[in-house]
Amino acid sequence: MAGIAIKLAKDREAAEGLGSHERAIKYLNQDYETLRNECLEAGALFQDPSFPALPSSLGYKELGPYSSKTRGIEWKRPTEICADPQFIIGGATRTDICQGALGDCWLLAAIASLTLNEEILARVVPPDQSFQENYAGIFHFQFWQYGEWVEVVVDDRLPTKDGELLFVHSAEGSEFWSALLEKAYAKINGCYEALSGGATTEGFEDFTGGIAEWYELRKPPPNLFKIIQKALEKGSLLGCSIDITSAADSEAVTYQKLVKGHAYSVTGAEEVESSGSLQKLIRIRNPWGQVEWTGKWNDNCPSWNTVDPEVRANLTERQEDGEFWMSFSDFLRHYSRLEICNLTPDTLTCDSYKKWKLTKMDGNWRRGSTAGGCRNYPNTFWMNPQYLIKLEEEDEDEEDGERGCTFLVGLIQKHRRRQRKMGEDMHTIGFGIYEVPEELTGQTNIHLGKNFFLTTRARERSDTFINLREVLNRFKLPPGEYVLVPSTFEPHKDGDFCIRVFSEKKADYQAVDDEIEANIEEIDANEEDIDDGFRRLFVQLAGEDAEISAFELQTILRRVLAKRQDIKSDGFSIETCKIMVDMLDEDGSGKLGLKEFYILWTKIQKYQKIYREIDVDRSGTMNSYEMRKALEEAGFKLPCQLHQVIVARFADDELIIDFDNFVRCLVRLETLFKIFKQLDPENTGTIQLNLASWLSFSVL
């Protein structure tokens, strides 16, 4: 229940703007300004208690407390490492980022790309920090985390060995912004070792809040040139690189002056007429040197003489140092990988860009209720969360004659790096997209069931199920309604996720879920209508006071269930018997009279019938995935979040719900619905309670 309250509070804060870049969430409630001022007033340097200068901050296995790699490590402040430490010298550049003894080259490549754009760098690395003015041993950075911007505070104690920084360091040795940025990122992910292994796109996204896609240029999609042009129009960050096959290859220069293992940026894509035919050209920037392409379409290439002088001047006169043009075919031949980070509208301050439309939806998989696994598990796949996508407007221009609506889908699993310390790692994740059948279009309150997925093929799906933080794909579909189903590969895997959809045109997205509904069959009973046989049974069971208490009810039901072979049960707990009595005890006596007992007896017989019918394997029990169908048979339609709560409350460790817990759940639900209905006679869907009333109902 605490988790639900926290989620509701977070939703309200997000609606008020908390989590935007301007109102970043204070990680672990640490406020940079407050902590720095406290240190300045006390004349002390900040020591971060939440990420201490101890082995636990380094790692858990290879960098664990007893690892040979962590022997002899000392934590030192930059003022202890060199005579004149600087935060940033002459702007952030690639040479500020040299890899240390940690396998986080993916992160460093993303940081290197970040230095190409000063405006975006300043969003992550606030520039007003130094080791001179108002120095208090504290620094702060901002990262995007699953739809929210988070401000992370660190002290400047850094791990060293033999007087040298152990991890990221600058070539000059006196510049520390990159080492402190790495430390802040390690903190938000649990420890330094958690950063080992990853994809550059992960860093791209956490530094920009964008959605990053990448292409192997050996197998480019046929419309890649158009994708690049559109990305540039939208202000996206584009990077390309040439793979290296060994450490010796790093920074090696090819015969046509391209540098291997080097992060280049793509800054232009144009088609020009040359000798009567159209040539596709790509403009590339090498921001860290004068080494430029010497192949066709370089600055001095005769091919430029075949281009209209005005076009040539327009393309070449505005080039910056290190920029050069090359043909698109040469680009595909020489470069290995292209990465595109599509930025969110709030990141782009220039109005000239055509901005993406962005939607983010959060969800979770919970073992036993909404963690259904992939299509290989048809009995549970349908129970995964479902999201409706309404594509209404086609793109303005066609790509290769294909009309439709372009959109990107990114499925991110949350906080998995942070859980590596506990032995967890990335789940294998993916998603499918299904066309909504015509008879269901326009409806958002129907969770598609098992039969739909048994008879319907996915219209699109993620390229693969993979154990990375994010699975991302670009699609183009005709206008219409589609349902997106994210899942882990195997069922029963707990996890939180967010889905982001970037679309060229406005589109609607929302969770698909059953509306809350209770169609409870009312049992009309007058004492005169109750047959004599039941009356005699009641007198025999109730005794002299002609009423049945919860304790007497427990004894009665235990005898009844002991005779049944088709339902496994140890009888009813006293708690279940008490809530059954509470549900029907209208006079407040704490006991059931003849009429009340008759109604309860009728309900229990109905519950038994449902339990047997849902138990298709005749095990005498019900698993948690069958519970959803059983609740529907009993008249309840509930959203996924409530199914998660029910499984957590009423299923055992093996996801079995016995008859006692099944009945307790149904009685609890019926009681809550009745209370709500009595307090909301106008059917507004809302009630108001003071604290005393809330507590009274909560302890039912």
Curated annotation (Swiss-Prot):
Named cofactor requirement(s): Ca(2+)
Catalytic activity: Broad endopeptidase specificity
Gene Ontology CC terms: calpain complex; chromatin; cytoplasm; cytosol; dendrite; external side of plasma membrane; focal adhesion; Golgi apparatus
GO terms of biological process kind: behavioral response to pain; blastocyst development; cellular response to amino acid stimulus; cellular response to interferon-beta; cellular response to lipopolysaccharide; female pregnancy; myoblast fusion; positive regulation of cardiac muscle cell apoptotic process
Domain Calpain catalytic: residue ranges: 45-344
Name listed for the protein in its UniProt record: Calpain-2 catalytic subunit
Family: Belongs to the peptidase C2 family.
